[in-house]
């Protein structure tokens, strides 16, 4: 593939990773199954999941928040890719906290756990929340052997909180109430709920 000088990422096929290793930002090569690459990959998946959510019709304030988070996640991925460098700041974490408070302020208080779902944008926000939690687990796993910044770890924890609140807020925008978890739901269902054509 021909490349032009000045185009940072114009060369896509490099073949350097065919042996199962990949390069970090500092030039070192590590296995593609390493803890650091796993954390980077989870961060990439989280960002892509937010991209799917952004493809939905959304309130403009939510859209701008999510777009900002996508940029933050590139900072976070860059920090993971450059051991010893710090890109995620306390200010970015605090901004998430402000957004959580702002979006949560107009929501009714929860008296029970809620099920992920409702409108499609809300369901995608909940999906992004679970991917964020998985990303956080991968980061913590890496942190045990290769310490990471406090701000980076806190960012992912706050982001999952924000995505939970956004899921509720997006349902409210769609006129959809929270779907509350009902303890023992299936044991309370009447006998006539047996699927048609099934046999006891």
Task: List each model region and its residues.
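Phosphate/pyrophosphate-binding loop motifs in nucleotide- or prenyl diphosphate-using proteins
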Residues: 1-200
